[in-house]
């Protein structure tokens, strides 16, 4: 990889991930007239992932730290009710195809490392489901770690966060239905015309700002 900031290297690789358990809950549909381009499957339905690698300059504790950032995009079958990857050959009416983004940041502050990862799942059927169904973030460093997750339910997003730090602790909130900044990366890949315009509410990224 060339050490040039914000120049990405695209690779193709096969990806396989395991399913995990998640609570069941209905998801509300929101109809629009926007869809993915007709040739979407020529690139995204070939059983491969798109990997983009970046050099990173991360601000933390009042200083700029060098590191690496990686974006991995891939399509996969997804359960609407459980909001996990479907491993069954036929998922039936519960199955949606999503564009998943796994993004990571790795950098060192002083003597100890930071590892961050976010996974965001956006339905390819953006005409029926214009917003991300799920977004989960983990932050690990030597003091402790934090995990947070958004799930789109019938009445909006359910947000849960679990933290090592007393000031954050375990939290749970319900949000009407804002846009998630972490979902914008997928919106651009699916169809830039699906991006929100005008006045709207957006939840900032769960990642540390760059």
Task: Please report, for each region that a protein language model flagged, where it lies by residue.
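An N-terminal, globular interaction/scaffold subdomain
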Residues: 65-78, 86
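A glycine-rich, acidic short-motif signal
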Residues: 89-95
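Contiguous hydrophobic, core-forming segments of folded domains
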Residues: 28-60, 72-73, 96-209
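Charged, amphipathic alpha-helical segments
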Residues: 80-86, 98-99
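Sec-dependent signal peptide recognition
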Residues: 2-8
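Bacterial Sec signal peptide processing site at the extreme N-terminus
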Residues: 19-29
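C-terminal motif of bacterial Sec signal peptides marking the signal peptidase cleavage site
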Residues: 15-16
């Amino acid at each position: 990889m060339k050490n040039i900031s914000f120049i990405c290297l695209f690779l193709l690789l096969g990806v396989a991930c395991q399913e995990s358990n998640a609570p069941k809950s209905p998801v509300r549909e929101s109809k629009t007239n926007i869809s993915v381009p007709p040739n979407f499957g020529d690139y995204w339905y070939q059983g491969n992932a798109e990997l983009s690698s970046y050099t990173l300059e991360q601000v933390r504790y009042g200083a700029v730290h060098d590191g690496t950032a990686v974006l991995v995009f891939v399509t996969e079958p997804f359960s609407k009710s459980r909001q996990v990857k479907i491993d069954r050959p036929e998922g039936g009416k519960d199955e949606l195809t999503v564009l998943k983004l796994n993004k990571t940041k790795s950098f060192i502050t002083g003597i100890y490392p930071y590892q961050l990862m976010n996974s965001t799942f956006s339905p390819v059927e953006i005409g029926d489901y214009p917003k991300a169904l799920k977004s989960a973030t983990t932050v690990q460093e030597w003091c402790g770690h934090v995990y947070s997750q958004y799930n789109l339910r019938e009445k909006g997003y359910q947000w849960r966060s679990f933290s090592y730090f007393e000031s954050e602790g375990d939290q749970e909130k319900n949000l009407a239905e804002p846009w998630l900044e972490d979902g914008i990366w997928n919106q651009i890949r699916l169809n830039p015309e699906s991006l929100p315009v005008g006045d709207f509410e957006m939840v900032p990224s769960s990642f540390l700002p760059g």
